[in-house]
C-alpha cells in the first residue's frame, strides 16, 4: 500500500498544503488546488490502495483551521466512500 505522509511543519500557510499534496502525490500540472479537484484526483488519478498520514495537524489559527479542514475532510470523505482503497491516519 502506497503511503503519503504530510507533516504540518512542512508549510506555514494552508494554501501551500495543496502544492505539497500535488508534489508528493505526483498530481498533474492541471490539478486545480481545491477540494473538488482533490476529490477528483483521489478517486480517479492516483494509484490505490493508499494511506494518507497526517502528522501534527492540531491547533491552528481560524483562517488556517477552516482552510485545512476542507482538505482533511476531503481525505476523510474519500476514505468513507472507498474504505477498501483509502485509509487516513492522524498522528497528533
Place the predicted regions along the sequence by residue.
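N-terminal intrinsically disordered, low-complexity segments enriched in P/E/S/T
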Residues: 1-30, 45-92
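Short glycine-rich substrate-engagement loop in P-loop NTPases that contacts/grips substrate
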Residues: 33-34
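Short, intrinsically disordered low-complexity segments
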Residues: 41-43
